[in-house]
Design a protein with these regions (language model features):
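Conserved catalytic core of nucleic-acid polymerases
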Residues: 131, 185, 293, 297-298, ...
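Short, contiguous acidic/charged loop-to-helix segments that flank catalytic cores in large enzymes
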Residues: 42, 287, 318, 364-366, ...
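Catalytic-loop motifs flanking and including active-site residues across diverse enzymes
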Residues: 89, 106, 145-148, 175, ...
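Glycine- and acidic
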Residues: 54, 91, 132-138, 160-162, ...
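Function-dense linear segments that define catalytic or interfacial modules
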Residues: 29, 104-120, 127, 141, ...
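Conserved "right-hand" nucleotidyltransferase catalytic core of DNA-directed polymerases
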Residues: 1-45, 58, 64-67, 109, ...
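Charged catalytic and DNA/RNA-contacting regions of genome-maintenance
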Residues: 12-13, 41, 49-157
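Short, surface-exposed acidic
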Residues: 83-85, 117-124, 217-224, 240-247, ...
C-alpha cells in the first residue's frame, strides 16, 4: 500500500490543530480518483493504530508538501514519530522568493498570489480523507489550508526555478529544517544554581547602586523613569549637554556615555542599568524559559531576516552579552551534558574574505592568502608603517574601517565609532580605498547594478528587492545603497 502511494506528492498537515499529541491531524491526499482510493484503503489498513498511520504517512517514501516544515518536524519528532519525506515548504519558498515582504502566513500568501481571501468553510460532508467521520468546523478549515498549500506549491516551485533559487532551496534551506528541529528539541543545558546565584548578586549590586544614586541626587526618585532621571541630572544637578524633547530630557545610553565623567552619578546610573538589564533579561528571563529538565529550548526563525540569517526567539539566545566581563558570565551558565564538552566554532573573518573574493581585489586577497592578520595588514597599508610596528590602536581603527566598509559606513559614523574627527575618518577611508582599489570599484559597480536591476543577490542567488535605491528621498536612497553594498556579502555568509 505504501508503494502505491510513494510516487504521489501529498499535502501534509500545515497545522496540528493545536493538539500536541497529533490526534487532530487530517491528511488531504489529493483529489484524483486513484489517490482518493489509495488514501481510503490506506486509512482502513491502519485503523485503530494512530501512531502507525502517522509513521507511515511521514516516512521518507511518502513525498509531502507542507507549510512551516520545521515546526511540523519538531512536533513529529517530539512525539517519537517519523519526520521524513518533506519535499517542499511553501513558507520557506515564499521567503526565498521575496525576503522583504514579511508576510509568510498561509492566508497572507494565498491572498498575495491569488488575490482572494482564504475561505474557511464551516462544514464539509464526511469523505474518505477524514479520519474522524463528521467534519467539524476546525477540520473544514484544515481542508481549506491544505488546498491553499497545494495551490501555492504549484506557483512557488516554478518561481524558485525561475529565480535560480532551486539549488539553494533544495540543498541548504529545506535540509536545514530537520537540523533546526532537532536543535530546538535538544535545547541548551543551563546551570540553574549558578544562574540563581548570579541573579542574587545582580540584585545586591543594583540595590547598593540605587542607594548611592539617591544619596548623590539628594532625594529618592524612580531611576527607571527617563523623565524623573532627566529632571535630576539636567534640571536639579545642571549637567551640561542636556537635550530636552517634548517628553522631557533625553537620558539614553549615548547621552549618558558622553556625560560619564562629568559627575559620579552618571556612571552609577549606567552601572545600575547594566545590572538591572542583566537581571531582568537574562538571570530572570532564562530561568523562566528553562524546562523542567534544566534545558532551554529556543525557536529558530528561518523567514525573518532579509539577508537569510537565522533569528532566535522564545527566548533569543543570539544576543547573550559578551562585551563586558559581567555579561560574559551569562555564557558560562550554559554547560554541556555529563561526559560532553561545548565547542565554540566560528568562521574566521568570513565577511571580509567574501569581500576579497567578490571584489577581486588582489591586495586584499594577498593579505588573506599570506596568512597575516587582515586588520594588521590593513593598518600597515593605511598608516604606511611596517606590520611589526602596527600598534593596538592602529589595528583597532583598521578593524573598524574594514568592517565599516562592508556595511557602507560614512565618514561621520566611522568618526563616532573610533573617536576621531570626521576629517581623520575620511582620510582613513581614502587611504583604505587607495590600498584596496578593487573594493572601491566593487562598491561603485554593485550600487549601479542594483539601481539598474532594482535588486541585489548573493553568490547563491538569494535575492533582495531594493525599491529604496530609486527613491527621491535622500535618506531612503542612502539606505538602499548601504543594503546593496552589504547584502551580497552578509547574505552569502549566512
Amino acid at each position: 500500500m505504501i508503494k502505491s502511494l510513494s510516487s504521489k506528492v501529498f499535502t501534509a498537515p500545515c497545522t496540528v490543530l493545536a493538539l500536541p499529541d497529533l490526534s487532530g491531524v487530517i491528511v488531504d491526499c489529493g483529489t484524483g480518483t486513484d489517490t482518493a482510493l489509495s488514501a481510503e484503503f490506506f486509512f482502513e489498513r491502519y485503523a485503530g493504530d494512530w501512531n502507525a498511520l502517522l509513521n507511515a504517512l511521514f516516512a521518507a517514501d511518502i513525498r509531502k508538501v507542507s507549510h512551516n516544515v520545521k515546526d511540523l518536524m519538531r512536533t513529529l519528532l517530539e512525539n517519537g514519530l517519523n519526520a521524513e519525506g518533506f519535499v517542499f515548504d511553501t513558507a520557506l519558498a515564499a521567503y526565498l522568493a521575496d525576503a522583504t515582504s514579511g508576510k509568510y502566513e498561509i492566508g497572507q500568501l494565498f491572498a498575495g498570489y491569488f488575490h482572494t481571501e482564504l475561505v474557511k468553510p464551516v462544514h464539509l460532508e464526511p469523505d474518505a480523507f477524514s479520519l474522524l467521520g463528521d467534519v467539524t468546523a476546525a477540520e473544514a478549515a484544515f481542508h481549506s489550508y491544505t488546498s491553499a498549500v497545494d495551490a501555492l506549491y504549484g506557483v512557488l516551485a516554478p518561481k524558485l526555478k525561475e529565480l535560480d533559487l532551486w539549488d539553494l532551496y533544495a540543498t541548504a534551506e529545506l535540509p536545514l529544517c530537520r537540523v533546526l528541529a532537532e536543535m530546538e528539541l535538544a535545547g541548551c543545558r543551563v546551570d540553574k544554581g549558578a544562574l540563581v546565584s548570579f541573579g542574587e548578586m545582580l540584585s545586591e549590586k543594583a540595590n547598593a547602586l540605587e542607594q548611592n544614586i539617591y544619596s548623590m541626587a539628594g532625594e529618592e526618585f524612580n531611576i527607571n523613569s527617563p523623565k524623573q532621571l532627566g529632571e535630576i541630572l539636567f534640571g536639579k544637578l545642571g549637567l551640561p549637554h542636556g537635550k530636552k524633547t517634548k517628553t522631557g530630557w533625553s537620558t539614553n545610553a549615548d547621552v549618558l556615555e558622553k556625560l560619564r565623567y562629568e559627575a559620579p552619578i552618571v556612571g552609577a546610573v549606567l552601572e545600575y542599568r547594566q545590572y538591572t538589564k542583566l537581571k531582568s533579561t537574562y538571570a530572570e528571563g532564562l530561568l523562566k524559559a528553562m524546562d523542567p529538565d534544566g534545558r532551554i529550548r529556543t525557536r529558530f526563525q528561518m523567514t525573518v531576516t532579509a539577508t537569510g540569517r537565522l533569528s532566535s526567539t522564545e527566548p533569543n539566545l543570539q544576543n547573550i552579552p559578551t562585551r563586558t566581563d559581567l555579561g560574559s558570565e551569562i555564557r558560562r551558565m550554559f554547560i554541556p551534558a555529563e561526559g560532553c564538552v561545548l565547542v565554540d566554532a566560528d568562521y574566521s573573518q568570513i565577511e571580509l574574505r567574501l569581500l576579497a573574493h567578490i571584489s577581486g581585489d588582489e591586495a586584499m586577497q594577498a593579505a588573506f592568502t599570506s596568512g597575516t592578520d587582515i586588520h594588521t595588514a590593513t593598518a600597515a597599508q593605511v598608516f604606511h608603517v611596517d606590520p611589526a610596528d602596527v600598534t593596538h590602536e592602529m589595528r583597532r581603527r583598521a578593524k573598524a574601517v574594514n568592517f565599516g566598509i562592508v556595511y557602507g559606513i560614512s565618514a561621520f559614523s566611522l568618526s563616532q565609532d573610533i573617536g576621531v574627527t570626521v576629517a581623520e575618518a575620511k582620510a582613513y577611508m581614502e587611504a583604505y580605498f587607495a590600498t584596496f582599489p578593487g573594493v572601491r570599484k566593487y562598491m561603485d559597480d554593485v550600487v549601479a547594478k542594483a539601481r539598474e536591476q532594482g535588486y541585489v543577490e548573493t553568490l547563491f542567488h538569494r535575492r533582495r528587492d531594493l525599491p529604496e535605491i530609486k527613491s527621491s528621498n535622500f535618506n531612503m536612497r542612502s539606505f538602499g545603497e548601504r543594503v546593496a553594498l552589504n547584502m551580497p556579502i552578509q547574505g552569502t555568509a549566512a
